[in-house]
Structures are given as C-alpha cells and as structure tokens.
Amino acid sequence: MEIIENFLPEEQFKKIEDRVFGPNFPWYFQDGIVTTGDGNFKLTHLLYAHGNVNSDEFNLFRPVYEKFDMLSILKIKLNCIPKIETVRENGMHKDVDTNVDFTTAILYMNTNNGYTRFETGEKIMSERNKLIVFDGKIKHCGTTNSCDAHRRVLVNLNFIEDK
C-alpha cells in the first residue's frame, strides 16, 4: 500500500474541491452503500465505467488520473456519504468484480472522522488531498462520519496498470 499526502498541488486540488463541494455538482442517490438495499444510502457520481466516459465532469479530474501509468481505466467514481450520529463501517468488498489484476486508488476530498479499513486490519483516516493506492483484490470497507464535516467525499479509481 502506498499513502501520498498532498497528492495534488493545492491549486489543482482546490479547483476540483470547489466544483465537487459547490451547489451545482450533480450527485445521484444510491439505495445502499455496498449493495442495493443494505439499509444505508450514499450519493455518487460516475465519471467512467465500462469503457465509456459517463460525465461531463470527467476532464476536471484529469490531474488525478493522469498521475498513474494506466493500461486501462475500469471505473472512476465519486462517493458522498452523509454525516450520521456515529461512525459505522460498511461491508468489506472489492470495487470491481474481475479476474484480472487491478489497482485501486482513493483520493479523500475532505477531512473527517471516517476511514478506510482493510481486511488486513490497517485503517487509513480520511484526510483532505490524501491518496491511498493498493492492490484492487484486497477487500476493504469505508465508513460514515459523525464529525462537523457534513459529508465524507472521496474519488475512487480502479484501473489496470501499465507495468
């Protein structure tokens, strides 16, 4: 696992941050955090999946995905999990169901008391402009947050590396 603090230069990160946290960024309701109907909900914005750009916002995130040597992108998605009373872990999962080796990267858009936990037991706190990179076949789970941040927002990238 690799952890990179201050992943993007401040000016680049701020441009993305201002748009994502602005009043007109399009978020879409998902009935479930890990699986449909799991009793929770989140808002998402799918930038890229199944070989297609799915959003006019895709190019805004170019400074993020261009930092990787990718053979192909599998999926890029933003997650927005609203604040609740207590921090709750969601189910362990892999982001993409595939037999090929792939990499997952998570860019935390804001600091809050949520985190990502791995099946290995490691726990990475959500901190603004921090990126974690790991083997996509490692199961992990995200959480809610219960601090003064009204939401936990992250960018989730899944891709095949050009090795």
Where does each model-flagged region fall?
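A short glycine-rich, His/Asp/Glu-containing loop-to-beta-strand
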Residues: 66-86
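A short beta-strand-loop-beta hairpin characteristic of the jelly-roll/cupin
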Residues: 86-92, 99-102, 108-127
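A short hydrophobic beta-strand segment most commonly corresponding to one strand
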Residues: 105-107, 148-163
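Short beta-strand His + acidic residue motifs that chelate non-heme Fe in jelly-roll/DSBH
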Residues: 91-93, 139-147
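A generic structural micro-feature
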Residues: 96-101, 147-151
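Non-heme Fe(II)/2-oxoglutarate
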Residues: 1-72
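Conserved metal-binding segment of the jelly-roll/cupin
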Residues: 124-141
